[in-house]
């Protein structure tokens, strides 16, 4: 698992290690293994995928299943395009090539992103929607999707790419993500703190908890389906999320939010249309079900 100490990676790692049937796990990250993840079944490699020595360590043993989660976040990749390319594109291609040489056709689950779509219209969005990425991060994600599909076509990998929406609630301080306000809103109101929201109450986004994301990643590792899929998510307005927080923590929490919309942020992260994920739902992928369950899952993940 790459990015194994990250927000999603650490949650997935702990889930895998809690399952005695999941086998041995190798985690890779720039940092140390999460404190909650330990045991004889865990091997840890500290380093980056863009380091040739790290790739050589990974190549020492074959893998049956690989979760590729590591990436440079969108806003940083936009500010530092050379770093973004080295990690998000080149290192991903090198990883796939390494896994393809193992000759046992490993299953590869790749964490892609809704950033591949670019500017959105009011029409429902799904994998059938044309990918027109508007930022470097999204462009690199789309390139890696194509590379994984080509390895799958050639028969040396069994690849599935999942386009992830906004995942909540990232631990504080939330940085490097344009959608950071989604997590900050949940943390602030749950803690009884005042929060100035940079988008309007009517702004809509796609919301998915880390807990539900892990469920979907594990499913992707088990099923035979290959290709690119859009993960289901709840399409909720900020007002609906605030109402859910008020139901859980008390009606007075609604008054803690004030709004100071930033047009640039709302244009990119606050005008999401409906999702068309009928095919993904039929395969067993899922979202959190309701605003209240989303909040519960997000804050206990």
Question: How should each PLM-predicted stretch be described?
Answer:
Residues 119, 134-160:
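Active-site Tyr-X1-5-Lys
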């Amino acid at each position: 698992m790459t990015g194994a100490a990250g927000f999603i990676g650490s949650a997935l790692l702990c889930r895998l290690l809690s399952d005695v049937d999941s086998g041995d796990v190798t985690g890779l990250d720039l940092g140390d293994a999460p404190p909650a993840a330990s045991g004889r079944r865990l091997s840890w490699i500290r380093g980056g995928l863009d380091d040739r020595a790290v790739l050589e360590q990974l190549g020492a043993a074959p893998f049956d299943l690989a979760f590729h989660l590591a990436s440079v976040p969108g806003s940083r990749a936009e500010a530092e395009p050379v770093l973004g390319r080295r990690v998000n594109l080149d290192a991903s291609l090198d990883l796939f090539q390494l896994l393809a040489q193992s000759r046992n056709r490993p299953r590869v689950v790749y964490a892609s992103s809704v950033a591949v779509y670019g500017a959105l219209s009011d029409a429902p969005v799904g994998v059938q929607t044309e990918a027109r990425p508007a930022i470097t991060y999204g462009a690199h994600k789309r390139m890696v999707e194509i590379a994984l599909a080509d390895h799958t076509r050639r028969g040396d990998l069994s690849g599935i790419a999942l386009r992830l929406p906004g995942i909540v609630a990232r631990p504080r301080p939330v940085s490097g993500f344009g959608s950071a306000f989604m997590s900050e809103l949940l943390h602030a109101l749950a803690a009884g703190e005042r929060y100035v929201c940079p988008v309007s109450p009517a702004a809509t986004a796609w919301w998915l908890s880390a807990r539900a994301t892990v469920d979907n990643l594990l499913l992707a590792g088990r099923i035979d389906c290959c290709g690119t899929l859009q993960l289901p998510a709840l399409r909720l307005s900020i007002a609906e999320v605030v109402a859910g927080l008020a139901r859980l923590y008390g009606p007075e929490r609604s008054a803690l939010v004030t709004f100071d919309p930033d047009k640039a942020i709302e244009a990119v992260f606050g005008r999401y249309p409906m999702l068309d994920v009928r095919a993904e739902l039929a395969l067993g992928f899922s979202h959190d079900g309701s605003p209240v369950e989303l909040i519960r899952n997000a804050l206990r993940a």
